[in-house]
Amino acid sequence: MAIERTLSIIKPDAVAKNVIGQIYSRFENAGLKIVASRMVHLSRADAEKFYAVHAARPFFKDLVEFMISGPVQVQVLEGEGAILKNRDLMGATDPKKAEKGTIRADFADSIDANAVHGSDAPETAAVEVAFFFPEVNVYSR
């Protein structure tokens, strides 16, 4: 497998629960390196731009409202098969359907407040990483 980078967001619900460190431990224990990280409180404009791919979907307005409801922790994860590995760690979008031991099963409350976001493909990962982190702010190690 190739070394990949993927974007991960710890959403407002998980930040409010003070579980950032526990989630970071899961990334690192799975062999993923955190090569960029920052906390940000998204503006409405930034949330709408980031999730523009979902603009026509019925959940778009609620998603934007949720994502601007509090700070988020945004990070770039790097490692072999990072995109799939992160998605496996996250679990199913609906925490009720997520496997026991996944981030969403352990920390999410609902399909809306589902603790984390992760890029779903190499193309989206590249766009999402660039949205939050100019290349000069990502450090391979």
Swiss-Prot record:
List the GO molecular function terms. ATP binding; metal ion binding; nucleoside diphosphate kinase activity
Which positions in this protein are listed as binding ATP?
11, 59, 87, 93, 104, 114
- Give its localization: Cytoplasm
Q: Where are the coiled-coil regions? A: none
Q: Name one GO biological process term.
A: GTP biosynthetic process
Catalytic activity line of the entry: a 2'-deoxyribonucleoside 5'-diphosphate + ATP = a 2'-deoxyribonucleoside 5'-triphosphate + ADP; a ribonucleoside 5'-diphosphate + ATP = a ribonucleoside 5'-triphosphate + ADP
- EC number annotated for this UniProt entry: 2.7.4.6
Q: Which PROSITE patterns match?
A: NDPK, NDPK_LIKE
State the GO CC annotations: cytoplasm
Kindly list the cofactors needed.
Mg(2+)
Top-level EC class, please? transferase
> What role does it play?
Major role in the synthesis of nucleoside triphosphates other than ATP. The ATP gamma phosphate is transferred to the NDP beta phosphate via a ping-pong mechanism, using a phosphorylated active-site intermediate.
| PANTHER family named among the record's database cross-references | NUCLEOSIDE DIPHOSPHATE KINASE, NUCLEOSIDE DIPHOSPHATE KINASE DDB_G0292928-RELATED
This chain's protein is named Nucleoside diphosphate kinase
Record organism: Paraburkholderia phymatum (strain DSM 17167 / CIP 108236 / LMG 21445 / STM815)
Gene symbol here is ndk
